[in-house]
C-alpha cells in the first residue's frame, strides 16, 4: 500500500471543482479508459486569456483524482500562458509528493492543460508531428515522453513507465522497432 500525503488524501476524499463546466470554452482530454486512467479538463477562459474557472472529470485512482483537483485550483486566475508553464513537478509539489508508481497521474494533469489550451487557441494537437503516439495502450505521445524525461531527469525505462504508463501494458512500444 502506498503512503499518501495529507494533501492527496484531502483532494481525493473532497476533490475540488468536479464535473462538467457550463460555459467552458476549452476542453482537454488525456489518458485512456482502457489503461484505467482518463482525465477531462474544462476551462472557462476570458477574452483576455485568463482562466476564470476550471473543473474536471476523471476515471482513476486517488492520485489521479488528487492531481486533477489540485490542478484546477492552481490554474484559476492564471493566464493561459502561465498555466502552460505548470509541470508535473509543480502538481506533485502541491500535493506534497506522490509515490513513484503514481507519478503518471501528475503527468496526465500536466498534459491535459496543454490539450485544453490548444483547443482554446484553435490548434489541432493531432496535426503536430511531435504528437505522434508512441504508446497506443496508454495514449502517450512522443512530445510528452521527451518533456517528462527532461523535466524529471528520468534515466531508465522503468522510471519512464512509472511517470507515463508507456510500456506498462502490451509492452510492444519498448521492444526494438515498437509496434
Q: What do the predicted segments below correspond to?
A:
Residues 73, 139-152:
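Amphipathic, charged-and-aliphatic alpha-helical interface segments
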Amino acid at each position: 500500500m502506498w503512503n499518501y500525503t495529507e494533501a492527496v488524501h484531502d483532494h481525493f476524499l473532497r476533490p475540488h471543482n468536479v464535473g462538467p463546466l457550463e460555459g467552458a470554452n476549452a476542453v482537454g482530454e488525456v489518458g485512456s479508459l482502457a489503461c484505467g486512467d482518463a482525465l477531462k479538463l474544462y476551462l472557462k477562459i476570458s477574452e483576455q486569456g485568463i482562466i476564470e474557472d476550471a473543473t474536471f472529470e476523471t476515471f482513476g485512482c486517488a492520485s489521479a483524482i488528487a492531481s486533477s483537483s489540485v490542478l484546477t485550483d492552481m490554474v484559476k486566475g492564471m493566464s493561459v500562458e502561465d498555466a502552460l508553464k505548470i509541470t508535473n513537478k509543480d502538481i506533485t509539489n502541491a500535493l506534497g509528493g506522490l509515490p513513484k508508481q503514481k507519478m503518471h497521474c501528475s503527468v496526465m494533469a500536466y498534459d491535459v492543460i496543454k490539450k485544453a489550451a490548444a483547443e482554446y487557441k484553435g490548434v489541432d494537437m493531432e496535426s503536430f508531428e511531435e504528437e505522434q503516439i508512441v504508446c497506443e495502450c496508454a495514449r502517450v505521445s512522443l512530445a510528452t515522453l521527451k518533456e517528462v524525461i527532461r523535466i524529471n531527469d528520468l534515466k531508465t525505462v522503468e522510471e519512464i513507465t512509472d511517470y507515463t504508463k508507456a510500456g506498462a501494458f502490451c509492452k510492444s512500444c519498448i521492444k526494438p522497432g515498437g509496434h
